[in-house]
Structure formats: C-alpha cells, structure tokens
A protein has these predicted regions:
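Acyl-donor (CoA/ACP) binding surface of acyl/acetyltransferases
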Residues: 230, 268, 300-340, 376-500
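Aromatic (often tryptophan-rich) hydrophobic motifs at membrane interfaces
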Residues: 210-298
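Conserved GNAT acetyl-CoA-binding A-motif
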Residues: 90-101, 262-271, 429-439
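Conserved active-site alpha-helix within GNAT-family acetyltransferase domains
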Residues: 104-118, 274-291, 417, 442-459, ...
Length: 500
C-alpha cells in the first residue's frame, strides 16, 4: 500500500535523481517547480517500484502525476501505476491523473478503455524552444530580439553576465526586492505565490543543482535567470528584469542560453503563461517549437455511470433498492452480530450513537451509493427482504468485489447462490465489469458453499468467463473485531471471475 507523505522542501535533494534524467520536457517534473509550487498545491509524494509518485490537492480533490522512474523504465512506471490504482481503490479516492505527457496517452487509453475524460488546458501548456535559437537568435524571424539585444548593448556598453554564487545572494535579494516593489500584481494569488517562491529558492540554488546567472549594467544587477537541467531540456524557473532597462529580457535569455545551454541541451522550456495575455504574446514572439501538453485524465469506474440503483430479476428473487418502509427489516439484518462478523464491516465505526434508529442503517448504505462507493441491493423473496448483495470496492480496470448476507431464517435455501449469480450477471453484462472478486473466511462455511456454487453457475451461464481461485491471507481490515475472533490468523478463500 502506498504511503503518501507531505512533500517538504527538505525532501527534494534526495529526490533529484528522479528529475535529472527525465525526458518528458515538462516543468512539473522538476525540483525547482515543486520547490516553488509544492506548498500551494499541497503536494505529497510516495515511492514504489523505483518510481516517484506525486499527488496534488486542489479544492479538496486529489490529482496524481504519472509515475516517474529515474531512468525512463516504462515497465517500472506501469507497475507503480498498478500500485496507485490499488491505493485509490482501497482509500476510495478517485484516480485523476494530471500533467500526463502526450506519449503516455495511448497506453493509458488502452489500459482504461474509452471511458475517460481527457483535457489539455491551453494556459498550462509549457513553451518549448530550440536551445540553439536562443543562443544565436538566427535569421529574420528573430530580428526583433536581435535588435533589442543590440540596443541594450549599445545603451550599456559595460554590461556583463555572470554566474551567481552563494556570495551573490544579498545582491540577488536586493534585486528581487526592487523588482517586487513595482513589477508584479500583488492582488494576483498566483503572482504572489510565484514571487514568494522566487525569494525562497535563491538560498537553495546549489543544493538543488540549479543554474543561476545575472545580467549587470553600470555595475548594478538588472536581470536574473534560474534554470534546471532535466535530460536534454533546460527548464527556466525564474526570469526577471527591471522595468526601464530596455532589452534586458532578450539579453539575459540569450546570455543564459549561451552560458548554460550547451553540451547536450537541445531544448529550453520556459514554462506556461498561466493565461496572462501579455506573457502569452511575449512567449509566442520567441517562436516555440512546441506547446507541450499537460493532459488531465479522469478515469471512470463502472459505478460512476449509475444515477440510480438497478433492479435485477432472477428465477425466484428480485434484487433492488430498499425502500423506507423496509428500514426496520434491514436494521435487523444490519444489526445481526453473527452476520456482521463475516461481513467485513462494523457499523459502529460509522456512528457515535450506541443505538441508532432503524432508518440510520438505510441512510448509511444510500450515502455509500451516492458517493459511488458501492451498489447495495436488497434481496427480496416476493415482498420480503431476506438479505443484501453488494458490489463494492470498484477498481479502475473494470473490477469490483462482491459480498452478500442472508438472514439466518432464509439460509440453506439457495438464496445466496441465486443472488450472487444475478448480481454477477448484472455486473458483467450491464455494468461492463471485467473482473469480480469475492472473499470469505474459511470458518464461514455458508458463504464458502454459496461462492463455490455461484462459481459453477456463472461458468455454465456465461461460458465466456474463466474462473480462477487462489489462496490469500486476510488481515484485520477484512473483518470487524468480534469477541474471540482473530481474523488476521485466518486463511480465507479468494475467488475471482474474469472475462476471457
């Protein structure tokens, strides 16, 4: 199980190997970006299969980056994605991928099918440039930039570009204070966050392995640039110039490229424009070779398409939503200690009331359906509620887990077997599930018999299905505490039905 922890800036030096070799050419997968924006985005991280997994939180929702290996190991990244799917399934978090590189789109569509919502928002796309173009500003297309640089050089003949070292920190901070006093919109939350991140990162330039240079004119710092090399790309995290110093921006951009963007640097990533009109115009004037998409993928599960509970008819039974008038009967089922011992759910963990009203149990399962956690259906023999069958723990590759409980007076009549078969047929044929799982403790002979019988029935009824059976060790999480019962020591039976 993945363990996401808050990404502190002190973690980043240890994580640098993940960023240094990445060839995605996206600014999001870099130490400088995460240092400056990680607090704002409430970034957390985990490691699995030799990969780094990142998670942002925005408006109460989680957004996961595509796993990043240190050496571009696609197989390891897919295994890490498996772990992420299991994490989301177990923690009931939605799998929403963000900042996905374009080259990962096709494998993800193949992995999850067509039931995806994909977006690629224009204002967050990174501007990617040919590094040689910035070094030389060649040809007629860059005549404007060359003219601005020539004007700067003519106006400030004593200009010089220097690499910044630790002893230059006071001068850099003084420059930023002058810049901040006049040149950014303090009412813009993103601009304010970016400015604070700029101040914060300067003392950590060497620690993060960043490149930093400043342009001086008349002995005064007039422009500053900070970048980070990731693979064959230099990502420009900071570029500031004082207002009134004509030509300082194209001059510092060129000087930085000539100083740091050689020896295998093919591209310069100047990040996004955040939807700022002036910034967009400026970035386009430098003629990007590509606007690098950052794709967002919301992966849908089979349950997400349901707006109301279904009704399933079998030979003797009806599986349907439980109405208000059956709240007392359902409460009897929900309160049955022996049944709940095997059910894997302790209602006492969901309420502080020692003796909740009957209606509470019904509202509890309705809550779970509204939040797309499960499909709970009452098992009806005629008009009598005799049990419950549930599809739950929905995964992101068309899988779910099934469970059922039948009142003692109605057991040993084949009801559990028939209800399981009906629910599985619905899951496979109507919901489009590819895999249904069932678990039970070996002491629970009633459920074990029903599962074995349902396995035989489903195989006969749906010949395209291939049954599979294995052995697993169930943990304390698989069942609620019960007097004298230690489920962690019980070896249970795991059944899985998968479409061929």
């Amino acid at each position: 199980m993945l363990n996401f922890q808050k990404l502190e800036r002190s973690h980043l030096p240890r994580l640098l190997p993940y960023f240094r070799g990445q060839e995605r050419r996206l600014s999001n997968y870099s130490a400088g970006f995460l240092f400056m924006w990680g607090r704002y985005m409430d970034t957390h991280f985990a490691e699995a299969e030799g990969c780094l997994l990142l998670r942002d939180r925005y408006v109460g929702k989680s957004y996961f980056y595509y796993p990043l290996s240190k050496d571009g190991d696609a197989a390891a990244e897919e295994r890490a994605l498996d772990a992420l799917e299991e994490y989301c399934r177990s923690s009931e978090e939605r799998l929403h991928l963000t900042a996905v590189p374009r080259e990962k789109l096709a494998p993800l569509v193949e992995r999850y099918g067509a039931d995806l919502h994909v977006s690629n928002i224009r204002r967050w796309r990174d501007y990617l440039y040919d590094a040689s173009s910035f070094r030389d500003y060649p040809g007629g297309r860059y005549s404007g930039q060359r003219n601005h640089v020539h004007k700067f050089e003519k106006t400030y003949p004593d200009h010089v570009f220097r690499t910044c070292e630790a002893e230059d920190l006071p001068a850099m901070q003084k420059f930023l204070c002058e810049y901040a006093d006049t040149q950014y919109d303090k009412d813009d939350v993103l601009a304010d966050e970016e400015m604070q991140g700029t101040f914060d990162i300067l003392p950590h330039i060497a620690e993060l392995g960043l490149y930093c240079g400043a342009l001086y004119a008349g002995g005064k710092m007039v422009a500053l640039s900070v970048g980070e090399r990731c693979g064959d790309t230099m990502i420009i995290h900071i570029e500031k110039a004082l207002r009134g110093v004509a030509g300082a921006y194209p001059a510092v951009a060129q000087a930085f490229a000539r100083t740091f963007c050689a020896d295998g640097v093919r591209y310069i990533n100047r990040e996004d424009d955040s939807g700022d009109v002036g910034l967009r115009k400026s970035k386009l004037q430098y003629l990007p070779v590509q606007l690098v998409g950052k794709y967002n993928l919301a992966v849908h599960r089979a349950i997400d398409s349901l707006s109301k509970l279904p009704s399933v008819q079998t030979a003797r039974l009806t599986l349907r939503a439980i109405p208000d008038e059956d709240a007392p009967a359902f409460a009897v089922l929900a309160r049955d200690e022996e049944l709940n011992r095997w059910w894997g759910y302790n209602w006492r963990e969901r309420t502080s009331a020692e003796h909740p009203e009957d209606k509470w149990f019904l509202e509890d399962i309705r809550f779970d359906f509204r939040h797309k956690n499960e499909i709970p259906l009452g098992i009806y023999f005629g008009e009598t509620l005799v049990g419950e069958v549930v599809l739950h723990s929905f995964g992101y590759r068309a899988e779910a887990e099934i469970g059922m409980r039948v009142l003692p007076a109605w057991q040993r009549r084949g009801i559990a077997r028939e209800a399981l078969l009906g629910m599985m047929e619905y899951g496979f044929l109507k919901l489009g599930l590819e895999r249904i799982e069932a678990k039970c403790f070996k002491e629970n002979e009633v459920s074990a018999r029903a599962l074995r019988a349902a396995l035989e029935d489903i195989y006969r009824a749906l010949g395209e299905l291939r049954p599979r059976r294995g052995r697993v060790l169930l943990t304390l999480d698989d069942a609620p505490p019960a007097p004298g019962f230690e489920p962690a020591r019980q070896l249970g039976t795991f059944y899985a039905w998968r479409r061929s």
